[in-house]
Regions:
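Alpha-helical segment proximal to the catalytic Tyr-Lys
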Residues: 129, 173-177, 236
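Conserved glycine-rich cofactor-binding loop
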Residues: 23-24
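Residue(s) in the substrate-gating loop at a strand-loop-helix junction
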Residues: 144
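Substrate-binding pocket helix/loop in short-chain dehydrogenase/reductase
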Residues: 100-101, 105-113, 208
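Active-site helix of classical SDR
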Residues: 124, 160, 168
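Short, small/polar-rich loop/turn modules that mediate ligand/substrate recognition or access, typified
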Residues: 90, 176, 181, 238-240
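Short C-terminal tail/terminal secondary-structure segment
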Residues: 2-8, 149, 228, 239-252
Length: 252
């Protein structure tokens, strides 16, 4: 038997993938990498200019851009109405707030849970009600290693991502009868604009890197490749799973 150079179990040819939070970081990298593997991508975010930048780096044709604020029910409804049926959903949009417990505000809790937890739940609800996720489709929730590892000052963020992980498991049970899979990925620190937003000083970041056995943070495209595995037919028997991608930091 000869070697087949065209064989690729991670191919996304013929698949339509929705990626939220695609205007930067992991979302942008995922859209670009999915397009390289043949997917038609629907990218969404609040900033049209940054979405256009993502689109300019993608390859192939047939991609769609939807500007929507999915932290609101109105934004979720706009997104669900404007898109066609999909074969994959990457629920990536998220925010971070870092505060000690005694400084929590109700507004902070509502904001972070609305974006990180409630919005993904409402998008899935809307897509399923409209029957817009195709049979054998795949859902990937971008959670965080913070769902497992308790870092000082990170309680709100970690709780919102842990809730998303728990929801993923219930979602996986419910959609399995339709042949749809649901999984979550849990990155640790990834070198994106998200970590350079003044939440941490550069000195704190450099010190934190020493905790990683691989001595660096992850790259957005490395997270994207793990997402692609869970979107592709290579993971056809994988559902309800939480995949940790953290450069070994959880080993300590």
């Amino acid at each position: 038997m000869n070697f087949d150079p065209t064989y690729n179990p991670y191919s996304l040819v013929g698949k339509t993938i929705l990626i939220t939070g695609a205007s930067s970081g992991i979302g942008r990298a995922t859209a670009i990498e999915c397009s390289k593997l043949g997917a038609k991508c629907i990218i969404t975010g609040r900033n049209e200019e940054r979405l256009n930048e993502t689109l300019s780096q993608m390859v192939g044709g047939g991609h769609q851009e939807v500007v929507a604020d999915i932290s609101t029910q109105e934004g979720v409804d706009i997104l669900v109405e404007q898109i066609p049926n999909i074969d994959g959903l990457v629920s990536n949009a998220g925010i971070g707030i870092s505060k000690p417990i005694k400084f929590y505000k109700q507004e902070d809790l509502e904001t972070i849970f609305q974006t990180n937890t409630f919005s993904p739940m409402l998008i899935i609800k809307g897509m399923l009600k409209k029957k817009k996720v195709n049979e054998k489709g795949a859902i990937v929730f971008v959670s965080s290693v913070a769902a497992f590892n308790a870092k000082l000052g990170n309680g709100m963020y970690g709780a919102s991502k842990a809730a998303l992980m728990a929801y993923m498991r219930y979602c996986a049970r419910e959609v399995a009868e339709k042949g749809i899979r649901a999984n979550s990925i849990h990155p640790s620190m990834v070198d994106t604009p998200f970590i350079h937003d003044n939440t941490f000083s550069e000195e704190e970041l450099q010190k934190d890197i020493t905790n990683y056995p691989l001595k660096r943070y992850g790259k957005p495209e490395e997270i994207a490749q793990a997402i692609i595995y869970l979107l592709s037919d290579a993971s056809a028997w994988v559902t309800g799973t939480s995949l940790i991608i953290d450069g070994g930091v959880s080993l300590k």
